[in-house]
Amino acid sequence: MTNANVDATQLTTKPSQDGFYMPAEWAAQQAVWMIWPYRPDNWRSAGAYAQATFAKVADAIGGATPVYMGVPKAFLAEAKTVMPSHVTLVEMDSNDCWARDTGPTVVVNAEGECRGVDWGFNAWGGHNGGLYFPWDKDEQVAQQMLKQHGFARYSAPLILEGGSIHVDGEGTCMTSAECLLNANRNPDLTKEQIEDLLRDYLNVKQFIWLQDGVYMDETDGHIDNMCCFARPGEVILHWTDDETDPQYPRSKAALDVLQNTVDAQGRKLKIHLLPQPGPLYCTEEESLGVTEGTGVPRTAGERLAGSYVNFLITNNRIVFPLLDPTTDDIAAQKLQEIFPEYEIVGVPAREILLGGGNIHCITQQIPSGK
């Protein structure tokens, strides 16, 4: 167990000025970060089910990449008994466990040096539709992770969650208007100003804007639940053939955009369709295990924003969520077809979905750089 004190060196320049860029997820990784789930007003049974699931996710990742887990001091002893022994536990305060959204975006340069971008965070909407209050500890998470690795830090003047962007490492950024242009994130910035900031801090050139994310996604339509890059020039889209499903118009509109765009290198996109599970709904038993607090209520009968697109690429592995016995095998087969050179590892992940996200949402990769 190690301790991360907040003291990452802050830079006054921007990554693009310094020759740094965000690499694609399939670039070599030195580590993956996760955070211990414990909020009783978001995770049933005070997080016990989620903790067991996080342990399985950490174990699956650990077969390919070292795993770090931020854990509040009060839960360190418990985490040590639950987490696989190969996971490095780091004492770290947080308001919840969404490492993708509160962790840093690590950027690299041609020499293999790593630095981190620390974005603003307001719990997916602040006092205008945000998911909990306060979020002050979450605002310190990125800095603590960067300190652990000894990386210098860029502080970006933009409210942004890591789950709201995907890049191909070759100049293209994909995102959703539902999230990035939402009035509860950066109401004083225009679309053009947001793009300029993403150019500065991700060093990208071209943007692919999808309108909406997955139906009922409480993050306001994060791209990482809806669509991702498989490799340069190829994307994977969350899909349903059921035209009566509320998801259909969202996926169809996204497909129309993807079919009529090019990436930063001028390539037309090859589009893979990954079928949605379910539809899936929260049960009464699952909702009763969540206590009342400042978190968003978990209501029986509420549709869950389940998506197989919410997977992690980590070195030679794809770690994806198992969500529905009727479609899990189809998703695994499709992923193996898309990624023949990768080991496809499924982890039962309904407990993460009940809390509002999935495997990509609870992980944040640290690229190797070199």
Swiss-Prot record:
EC number: 3.5.3.12
Matching Pfam families: PAD_porph
Residues forming the catalytic site: C361 (amidino-cysteine intermediate)
Listed InterPro entries: Agmatine_deiminase, Peptidyl-Arg-deiminase_porph
Enzyme kind, highest EC tier: hydrolase
The entry's keywords: Hydrolase
Listed GO MF terms: agmatine deiminase activity; protein-arginine deiminase activity
Protein family per UniProt: Belongs to the agmatine deiminase family.
Protein name: Putative agmatine deiminase
Encoding gene, per UniProt annotation: aguA
